[in-house]
Amino acid sequence: MRIDVVSIFPEYLAPLELSLIGKARQDGILDLHVHDLRSFTTDRHRTVDDTPYGGGAGMVMKPEPWSQALTAVAEARRGHQGKPVLIVPSPAGERFTQALAHELAGEEHLAFACGRYEGIDERVIEWAGEHFDVRPVSLGDYVLNGGEVAVLAMVEAVGRLLPGVVGNPESLVEESHSDGLLEYPVYTKPAVWRDREVPAILLSGNHGKIAQWRRHEQFRRTSERRPDLLEVFDAGKLPKADRLALQELGYDIVDGRPVRRQGTAEPAG
């Protein structure tokens, strides 16, 4: 996979040289290029922003440097079928999820446009649609100073799904959000630490019961911490053990979705 990132702070992306993503770059699994937007300006001050039409606070990123930068990125796709995907981090975008990370991991070429100030001139987004599949994406319902932090998170979330990046592929299957639920709690040695014991079932050697306990803990933790995930969880084809786990937590299955039973207290969390 090729990834291009355009930013006025290219040094912000330095962490992508570390850990598993850095190793994936060294191994040729991930071809990552970071571009300085100011390199695509033409004035001696390397200006990338200007005042907004209509007034208002803040500055807006100028269209021409962005068009030059994105044209250069699109050139890398010449000779290939289809458009690259351009991710524009924005609090006004669709929410970034594990499902979206899996979708993007199937693409050959991703580009990221890191906005700053009040954002990028909207005409850039419209124009870019001629050359890219443009997708404004939000990490969540909050505002950051720029897109770089979001890009770090998204590149890692997508990159680690590529074959060969994570050493044990099975770990990707058991993670939070991989099946719409949060991950179960994990423990390591010693078995007793500061008078706190590892759950006995994990020391039993009974792999079937361990798997059942972990699944139950997924439902419990999701119910306590992210009940919104259960509201959209597809429970229509759950095995009997999973249905019993949900019932114990105060949920009934209605039209294929878990619904909290009336009179059941909301989970603490």
Swiss-Prot record:
<protein>
    <recommendedName>
        <fullName>tRNA (guanine-N(1)-)-methyltransferase</fullName>
        <ecNumber>2.1.1.228</ecNumber>
    </recommendedName>
</protein>
<comment type="subunit">
    <text>Homodimer.</text>
</comment>
<keyword id="KW-0489">Methyltransferase</keyword>
<keyword id="KW-0819">tRNA processing</keyword>
<comment type="function">
    <text>Specifically methylates guanosine-37 in various tRNAs.</text>
</comment>
<feature type="binding site">
    <location>
        <begin position="139"/>
        <end position="144"/>
    </location>
    <ligand>
        <name>S-adenosyl-L-methionine</name>
    </ligand>
</feature>
<keyword id="KW-0949">S-adenosyl-L-methionine</keyword>
<dbReference type="InterPro" id="IPR029026">
    <property type="entry name" value="tRNA_m1G_MTases_N"/>
</dbReference>
<keyword id="KW-0963">Cytoplasm</keyword>
<comment type="similarity">
    <text>Belongs to the RNA methyltransferase TrmD family.</text>
</comment>
<dbReference type="GO" id="GO:0052906">
    <property type="term" value="F:tRNA (guanine(37)-N1)-methyltransferase activity"/>
</dbReference>
<dbReference type="InterPro" id="IPR023148">
    <property type="entry name" value="tRNA_m1G_MeTrfase_C_sf"/>
</dbReference>
<dbReference type="GO" id="GO:0002939">
    <property type="term" value="P:tRNA N1-guanine methylation"/>
</dbReference>
<dbReference type="InterPro" id="IPR029028">
    <property type="entry name" value="Alpha/beta_knot_MTases"/>
</dbReference>
<dbReference type="InterPro" id="IPR016009">
    <property type="entry name" value="tRNA_MeTrfase_TRMD/TRM10"/>
</dbReference>
<feature type="binding site">
    <location>
        <position position="115"/>
    </location>
    <ligand>
        <name>S-adenosyl-L-methionine</name>
    </ligand>
</feature>
<keyword id="KW-0808">Transferase</keyword>
<dbReference type="GO" id="GO:0005829">
    <property type="term" value="C:cytosol"/>
</dbReference>
<dbReference type="Pfam" id="PF01746">
    <property type="entry name" value="tRNA_m1G_MT"/>
</dbReference>
<dbReference type="InterPro" id="IPR002649">
    <property type="entry name" value="tRNA_m1G_MeTrfase_TrmD"/>
</dbReference>
